Amino acid sequence: MEHTYQYAWIIPFLPLPVPMLIGVGLLLVPRATKNLRRMWAFPSVLLLSIVMIFSADLSIQQLNGSSIYQYVWSWTINNDFSLEFGYLIDPLTSIMSILITTVGIMVLVYSDNYMSHDQGYLRFFAYMSFSNTSMLGLVTSSNLIQIYIFWELVGMCSYLLIGFWFTRPIAANACQKAFVTNRVGDFGLLLGILGLYWITGSFEFRDLFEIFNNLIYNNRVNSLFVTLCASLLFVGAVAKSAQFPLHIWLPDAMEGPTPISALIHAATMVAAGIFLVARLFPLFTVIPYIMNLISLIGIITVLLGATLALAQKDIKRSLAYSTMSQLGYTMLALGMGSYRAALFHLITHAYSKALLFLGSGSIIHSMETVVGYSPEKSQNMALMGGLTKYAPITKTAFLLGTLSLCGIPPLACFWSKDEILNDSWLYSPIFAIIACSTAGLTAFYMFRMYLLTFEGHLNVHFQNYSGKKNSSFYSISIWGKKETKTINIRKYFCLSTLSTMNDNEKDSYFLKKGYPIHGNVRSMARPLITISHFGNKETFPYPHESDNTMLLPLLVLVLFTLFVGFIGIPFDQEGMDLDILSKWLAPSINLLHPNLSNSVDWYEFITNAIFSVSIAYFGIFIASLLYRPVYSSFQNLELINFFVKMGPNRILWDQLLNIIYNWSYNRGYIDFFYAKTFIRGIRGLAELTHFFDRRVIDGITNGVGVTSFFVGEGIKYVGGGRISSYLFLYLSYVLIFLLISYFLFLNL
C-alpha cells in the first residue's frame, strides 16, 4: 500500500503536459497544431482518466486501511526557518481527487463537441487542463504555503476561463470582477497564513494543528489575535466559494462557455473554499467564535442565494445562485460541526450541479440555432418552453438534476440535504427554520426553471409586433467574438399577465398573474410570454437534440445523481453497514470526534425525511401552479378564481410579489450598494490621489526646477558672460557665507 502512496506526488502533474504541448505547438508549428486541434481532447481526457484511476485506487486503500499518508521534502532549513514541500493523502484528498477527475472528464468530453466551432478550441483545453492541475495540486498540498500557491493558480485559471471570450466587454468585465473580488479573499488568506506561522512557527498541517491546540488548551496565546487570524483564513474561503458578502462575482462568471461554468461550479473554484475550511477544520473547531461565524455566513448565503434565484430569466444565472445557496448549506454544516454531512453534500451537489449545467449547455446549444449566437437570447428562459418535444434526453437529465437539488428521494442531494436539515435542528431552531424554508424555495425556483424551459410551447415563435423599441445586443459569432450588430426589437420580451390589465400597467416576470376566468375566458388564449422579433431571418425554425458526445456525459452524470447518494446512507442496524462515507472518512472523523456515531434508526430517518420531502413537494406544487402552461391549468379554475377574486388583498399580494421580484431581479441591490459605496469611494480616492500627485507633488518639484532656472538666468545676466565676473560673484557669496557663519558661531 505504501508503495502506491509513494507515487501519489504525480497526481497534480499528469494533466500538465497538455497545456505545455499546446503552447509549444502554437509557438513552433502553429498551422499544424491548429489543423489537428481536435486531437488534443484525447490526451486531455486520457491523462485525467489516469489520475481518476489512481485516485480511485488510493480511495479503496483508504477504505480498507483507514490511514493518512504524508511525505515531505525539505527545501530550505536553517536555525530560524524551515520550509518543506510534499503531499498529503487522507480521506479528504481522495474524495476531492475523485470529484475533480470524474467531473473534469465529463466536462472535457462534453466540451469537444460544444467548443468544436470555436476559434479558441486549443486555448480552451489548455486552460481546462491547467485548471485541473491547479485544483489537484491544491487538494494534495501538505502545508499552507503549497495551499496558497495552488490557490492562486486556481484563481488565475478561473480568471482566464471566465474571460475566455475576452473580446466581449461584458465577459472581460466579468473576469475582472471575479479577479478583484477574490483578491480581497486572497489577501485575507495570506494574512491569516502569516499570522498562524507567527503563532505556531510551522506551515505543516499536522504540526500546526498540534501546536495550535496545545496553545489554546494551555491559554498561552491571545484569543483575540487567534480569532482574527482564523477569520482572515475564512475570508479566503468566503470569496472563493461565493459566500455572502463576497458572492457578487458568481453570476457574472456565467459569461464564460457553459462547460467552464459546470467545472467551476461543481469541482474546482467554488469547491476550493469548502475544501479549505474542511482542511483547517481541526483549527476552527477549537475557536467557538469562528464556528459561529461560519454557520452564520452559511445560513445567510443559503437564504440570499435562494431569494436571488427566484426571478432570474437567464438559465445559467439561476443555476449560479443555486450553487451559491447550496454551498451555503455546506458551509452551514461545517459551522455546525457536521464535517461528514458537509462533505457529503459537497459530493452530491457537485454531480447534480454538473448535470444541470451541462444540461443547460445542451439547451443553449439547441436554442442558438433558433435565436442566434447571443447569450442574451439563447440563455433567456422567456424564449424557451416546449423543449421536451425537441430535446427529450436533455429534458430527462435536467429533470433528474432538478429533482435531486429539490431533495426528492432517492436522488443524491436528498440524502445529504436531509442530514444537514436534521443537524440544524440540534444546532439552532432559528437556523433550522431558515434552512427548511430555503429548501422549499429551492424546490420552487428549480422547478420554475424546468417548467419555463421544457413545458408549454416554444415561446420564441410567439411574436408581438405592437409597440416600438430599439435595443442593442452583443451577438456572439460561432468563433466567440463580438459582432457589432444592432438588432431591432419591436418590443422587449417580458412575461405578460393573463389578467385584463391595461397595456400601460407593469407586467411582472416573477409570476403569471391571476387568471381572469370570471371575466373573459377567451383571454386565456393569450400567450404566456410575449416575445420580441429579434430579426433572425436565417435560422432553423426549431431546436434540436444535442450530439451523442454531448449526451454521453449527461447520461453518466445521471448515473452519479441516481446512485452517489447511497454511499452516505446513515444506517447501521443488525450488522448491516451501509454507511460507506463514514468508513471512508473514519481517520478524519476519529481525529475530530473520537466517539461520534452517525448512524440513525429507520423510524428517525423516515420521520425526518417525510418532513423535508413535504417541504420540497410544496415548493414544486407552488411552482407548478404559477408556471405551468396555460392550456394545462383549466383543471385549477376554481382555485385560480379564488385568488383572482381576493379583492383588496389581491393588491397587497401583487405589491408583495413585486417587492420580491425587484429584490431578486436586482440581485438584492447588493451590487448597487457596492457600486455606490466601495467602487465610487475607491475611484474618488484614486482621483484625489491623482490630483494631489499632479498638482502638489509635481507642482513642488516643477516649482523648484522653474525657480532654479530663473535664478540661473538672473545670475547669467548679472555676470555678463565673463568668467572673471562669475568667479568674483562666487567668491563674494562664499565670503558672505563665512562671515555669517563666524558671527553665528561667536553668538553660540
Swiss-Prot record:
Transmembrane segments: 9-29, 40-60, 89-109, 121-140, 147-167, 185-205, 224-244, 258-278, 280-300, 327-347, 354-374, 396-416, 425-445, 551-571, 605-625, 726-746
Annotated keywords: Chloroplast, Membrane, NAD, NADP, Plastid, Plastoquinone, Quinone, Thylakoid, Translocase, Transmembrane, Transmembrane helix, Transport
GO cellular component, one term: chloroplast thylakoid membrane
Pfam family, one: Proton_antipo_N
EC number: 7.1.1.-
Cell compartment(s), UniProt: Plastid, Chloroplast thylakoid membrane
Top-level EC class: translocase
Record bears the keyword Nucleus: no
GO biological process, one term: ATP synthesis coupled electron transport
Catalytic activity line of the entry: a plastoquinone + NADH + (n+1) H(+)(in) = a plastoquinol + NAD(+) + n H(+)(out); a plastoquinone + NADPH + (n+1) H(+)(in) = a plastoquinol + NADP(+) + n H(+)(out)
The keyword Transport is assigned to this record: yes
GO function terms (MF aspect): NADH dehydrogenase (ubiquinone) activity; quinone binding
Topological category with respect to the lipid bilayer: Multi-pass membrane protein
Cystine pairings recorded for this chain: none
Subunit structure: NDH is composed of at least 16 different subunits, 5 of which are encoded in the nucleus.
Function, in words: NDH shuttles electrons from NAD(P)H:plastoquinone, via FMN and iron-sulfur (Fe-S) centers, to quinones in the photosynthetic chain and possibly in a chloroplast respiratory chain. The immediate electron acceptor for the enzyme in this species is believed to be plastoquinone. Couples the redox reaction to proton translocation, and thus conserves the redox energy in a proton gradient.
NCBIfam families: NDH_I_L, PRK06590.1
Family according to the record: Belongs to the complex I subunit 5 family.
PANTHER family: NADH-UBIQUINONE OXIDOREDUCTASE CHAIN 5
Protein name per its UniProtKB record: NAD(P)H-quinone oxidoreductase subunit 5, chloroplastic
The species this protein was found in: Platanus occidentalis
Gene: ndhF
